[in-house]
């Protein structure tokens, strides 16, 4: 089964993403902080990381830098409530970027696309 890690400091977002992605057949773990995400990434193998950019404490971009150094090849989808980052995301070494929304169609589509791309 494909395993995803969702990292967001907002509990409601973590639960929503986990529920929706689980319904699509993925095994989903969640983390509410960079420290929790780092611990899970050391303990388990993941096929995809869904990562909020702006979090209290360690930011999503700081976590992304660690992932790029330590877990080369792990695909990452960045999420944020702000559309203003969209033009810059390609320089952040992420595979995709989505704007948070109550409609998770874009997130689900990007999860499928990124996973398919990395399985080739």
PLM regions and their residue ranges:
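The feature encodes the CheY-like receiver
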Residues: 14, 56
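Charged docking surfaces used in two-component/phosphorelay signaling
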Residues: 15-23
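Acidic, metal-coordinating helix/loop segments flanking the phosphotransfer/catalytic sites
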Residues: 30-48
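Acidic catalytic/metal-coordinating carboxylates
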Residues: 33, 59-62
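Short amphipathic alpha-helix used as the core "switch/output" element in two-component signaling
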Residues: 39, 61-72
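Active-site residues of response regulator receiver
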Residues: 52
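Alpha4 helix (beta4-alpha4-beta5 surface) of REC/receiver domains from two-component response regulators
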Residues: 62, 82-100, 105-109
């Amino acid at each position: 089964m494909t395993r995803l890690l969702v990292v967001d400091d907002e509990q409601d977002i973590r639960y929503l993403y986990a529920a929706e992605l689980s319904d699509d057949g993925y095994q989903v773990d969640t983390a509410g902080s960079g420290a929790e995400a780092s611990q899970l990434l050391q303990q388990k193998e993941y096929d995809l990381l869904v990562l909020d950019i702006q979090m209290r404490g360690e930011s999503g971009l700081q976590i992304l830098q660690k992932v790029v150094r330590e877990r080369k090849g792990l695909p990452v989808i960045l999420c944020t409530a702000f559309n203003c980052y969209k033009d810059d995301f390609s320089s952040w070494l992420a595979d995709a970027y989505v704007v948070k929304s109550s409609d998770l169609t874009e997130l689900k589509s990007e999860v499928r696309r990124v996973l398919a791309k990395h399985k080739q």
